[in-house]
Structure formats: C-alpha cells, structure tokens
C-alpha cells in the first residue's frame, strides 16, 4: 500500500503525485465518501499563499462536492485559524492546503477533526487504504455546494487578542515581524499594531512564489540583521502557514521552540499554572531537559510531530508542549501550534517580569547541535553499511558526555536527517565531517548542514 501521509499531512512537489489536481480530486472524493457515510456534509477549507494552493483547493472542492459534501472556503488564513474555526463552527472536519515551511515548489494538505485537533494516524491509514483503490463515483442527486467566506479575519484577530489581559499594551515596543510571505501576512501586523507595537514589517508581500524564500522560521538571516539595524526590542518569525514561530532577541540571537517552551514552563510554574510537566520530542535539545530538571519540571519526549505532543498532553492532562522547530502547543488556547498566540504569550511574560527575551533565556544552555540533511533520499537502509556504522558506533567515545545521534526520515521533505548533539561544538563539527565523508564514500549524496547552537 502506498503511504501518502507524513508527520503533518500529505506533502510533496507540485505536479508530482500526490500533489496534483487529479490526486486532490480523488482525495476529495475519498474523504467525501467517508464523511458522507457518517452523515457529515460540510467542511471548512483554508489555504496559504502558494500559487498552486488555489488550483489544489479547486480540485479538492470538486471531489468533495461531487459526493455530496459542501465546502466553506475561507481563503488565505493561518493553519491554526482553520483549527479554531473548525471548533467554533462545530464542524467535523477542517482542511488546510499548505506546505508549511517549505518553499513554493512544494505543497500539501493537512486535516483537523472536531474540536480542531489533528487527524489521527488511524484515520490517515483509512484514507490511504481507499486512495489505493479504484474509486467508483455514482451519480449523486444532491451535489455539495461551495460557499465563500472571506470576512473571518476579524474573528480570529479578536480570538488571538483575547488570550491576553484586557489592559495589555505593547506601546512603543519595537518588533520586527517576518510573515514569510505566507498566511500571516495580513493578520499578524494588524494584531501587533492594534496592541500598540511599533512594527517593522518584512516578507509580507506574497506573490505566490516567494513564500519562505529567504525568510520565515527556516531562514533567519534577514530578520536577525533587521533586529540589529532597527535596534528593535525583538523579532518574531513565522513559517508559511503560521503554526510555527521562532523569536529573535535584541542581540540578534534566535530563540527556538525548546527555549520558548522553557520560558513558558518556568513562568507557568512560578504562577502556579503548570499542571504536571511539559512535552517535547526526540529532537528536543538536551539542554532543555537539563534546564527543566534543575527547576523541577518533569519532561517527556515523544515522536516528531505536534499531534504526538498533543496526544501525550491529553494523556497526562498537561498544558504545554513544543517542537524545536517552533510548533508550540498551549492547550489553554489551542490544540495545535499557533505562532501568533505563542509570541503574544512570550511578550506578556516579558512585560509581566519587566525583562527581555535575552534575559528569559539566560538560564537555559542549549547543547551544541548539528543537523545533516541528506537531500533527495528516502532510502535510509544504506546507512546500515558497515563503514557508516563503524563511524556511528564511535560517537559516544568521541563526543563524550550528553552526546547523542538521531537518524530519521523527514516527514515533511524528501531527505534523511541526522542530528548530532554533544557538549563540544568543535568535536561535533569534526565528527559531522567524518560522517559526511564516509556516507559519500558509500553513496554519493547532496547535503545541507544546519548548525543549531
């Protein structure tokens, strides 16, 4: 059976299966038939600013309407807004067409079910099973209809602001806002300006091709430069669909999801709002675990993907979880990552404590970490080669205390990720070069290297 779903929905290159109009039509028909069986006849669809998103939405709508399911099309909105409206309108399903932090060549789709939570892996497998069959479409007497609601922005703006105290203001606080030329490009500036902030706006002019292009949470150079040149108090960078956020302190240092989770957890504990502990993933920096341990906050890691964080939070009845990449779940407000709400909560802590983002991060010391991406490769089996395994087996001896290595297939891109972490950045650099050389000797590969800390 062909597997279509990754860690966050379906994703791929536009024009190649599964990111084609034909596939999205079939996907719409498959989902529609399943929903119709359960007497679900209406869903909500939003999208990001990619050129291909409109075409894919039209194809999906056609498949859905053909089997009797009606669609509320809300246009360009952040992913967490679709989660919010799925719950607000008491709908069974919400859909977002987006490839999140990927560039315009990619696109994808993700789903929410009742109460705005991500679709379960079990339901994804059910959809995949049907997609692997030949679809027979009978003539439906009642076709679904499509309605367009483009005036929902203010409702979501009001919701985001409602997560703050009534008298909260950001007067004269200078913020560089990077909207990644994506789904937050209209909403985010309105929200921060309405709160009184002095907003320096970047990457808020989408043209369908520039989403996440030298901007957004995976490319921070420009926002870091602007924070310094504008003498801003901090920077806030969203990804293309607004469910991730990375922040920049006034010295130009990035503050990722692990550090944001630490700031929130420490504040929650101080204010007696913390229920139990917090949840991260297997990619969470070891420095987070050490810092949380020092202040007595339990920490559990789960598989990559914010839905696994949500599942563990519900199981433990905890409230906070995050991925290093900037997906931060605050269950008091939303069941998914919401970049705007997360950044607002951090700003509230800064003002409550009369502090700075830099100071709030001062007692979490991130371990040096490098991520090696082996590009255009989804066959992880070659890493079992004895030469590669010989190098990997020596990492503990070479890197020392607190060191670890993780190898995994990316759930959002066509690549293999290798994370190397330890106490000494020099040793990690040396070891990563050794590993790249031996991998290349076994199989010629293209690499990208990200130095995290």
From Swiss-Prot:
Binds 1 Mg(2+) ion per subunit. Its EC number is 5.4.2.10. Coiled coil: none annotated. GO terms for biological process: carbohydrate metabolic process; peptidoglycan biosynthetic process; UDP-N-acetylglucosamine biosynthetic process. Keywords: Isomerase, Magnesium, Metal-binding, Phosphoprotein. The modification Phosphoserine is found at residue 100. Signal peptide: none annotated. Transmembrane segments: none annotated. Catalyzes the conversion of glucosamine-6-phosphate to glucosamine-1-phosphate. This is Phosphoglucosamine mutase. It comes from Buchnera aphidicola subsp. Baizongia pistaciae (strain Bp). The gene is glmM.
């Amino acid at each position: 059976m062909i597997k279509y779903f990754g860690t966050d929905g379906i994703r791929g290159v536009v024009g190649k299966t599964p990111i084609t109009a034909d596939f999205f039509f079939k996907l719409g028909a498959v989902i529609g038939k399943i929903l119709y069986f359960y007497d679900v006849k209406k869903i909500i669809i939003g999208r990001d600013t990619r050129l291909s998103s409109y075409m894919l939405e039209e194809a999906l709508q056609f498949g859905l309407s053909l089997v009797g399911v009606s669609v509320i099309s809300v246009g360009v909105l952040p992913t967490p807004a679709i989660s919010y409206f799925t719950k607000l309108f008491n709908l069974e399903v919400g859909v977002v067409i987006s490839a999140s932090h990927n560039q315009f060549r990619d696109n994808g789709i993700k789903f929410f079910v009742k109460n705005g939570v991500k679709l379960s892996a079990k339901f994804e497998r059910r959809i995949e099973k049907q997609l692997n069959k030949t679809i027979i479409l009978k003539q439906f007497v009642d076709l679904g209809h499509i309605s367009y609601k483009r005036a929902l922005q203010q409702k979501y703006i009001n919701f985001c602001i409602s997560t703050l105290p009534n008298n909260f203001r950001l007067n004269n606080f200078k913020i560089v806002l990077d909207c990644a030329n994506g789904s937050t490009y209209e909403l985010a500036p309105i929200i921060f300006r309405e709160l009184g902030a002095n907003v320096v706006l970047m990457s808020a002019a989408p043209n369908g091709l520039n989403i996440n292009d030298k901007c957004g949470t995976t490319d921070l150079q420009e926002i870091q430069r602007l924070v310094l040149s504008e003498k801003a108090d901090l920077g806030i960078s969203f990804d293309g669909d607004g469910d991730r956020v990375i922040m920049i302190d006034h010295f130009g240092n990035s503050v990722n999801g692990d550090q944001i989770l630490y700031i929130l957890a420490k504040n929650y504990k101080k204010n007696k709002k913390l229920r139990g502990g917090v949840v991260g993933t297997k990619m969470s920096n070891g420095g987070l675990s050490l810092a949380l341990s020092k202040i007595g906050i339990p920490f559990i890691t789960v598989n990559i993907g914010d839905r696994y964080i949500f599942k563990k939070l519900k199981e433990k009845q905890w409230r906070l979880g995050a991925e290093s990449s900037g997906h931060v779940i605050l269950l008091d407000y939303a069941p998914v990552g919401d970049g705007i709400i997360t950044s607002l909560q951090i700003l509230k802590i800064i003002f409550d404590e009369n502090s700075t983002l830099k100071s709030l991060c001062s007692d979490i010391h991130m371990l040096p970490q490098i991520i090696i991406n082996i590009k255009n490769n989804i066959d992880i089996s070659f890493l079992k080669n004895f030469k590669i395994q010989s190098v990997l087996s020596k990492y503990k001896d070479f890197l020392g205390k607190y060191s670890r290595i993780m190898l995994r297939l990316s759930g959002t891109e066509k690549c293999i990720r290798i994370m190397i972490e330890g106490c000494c950045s020099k040793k990690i650099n040396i070891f990563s070069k050794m590993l790249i050389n031996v991998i290349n000797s076994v199989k010629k590969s293209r690499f990208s290297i990200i130095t995290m800390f």
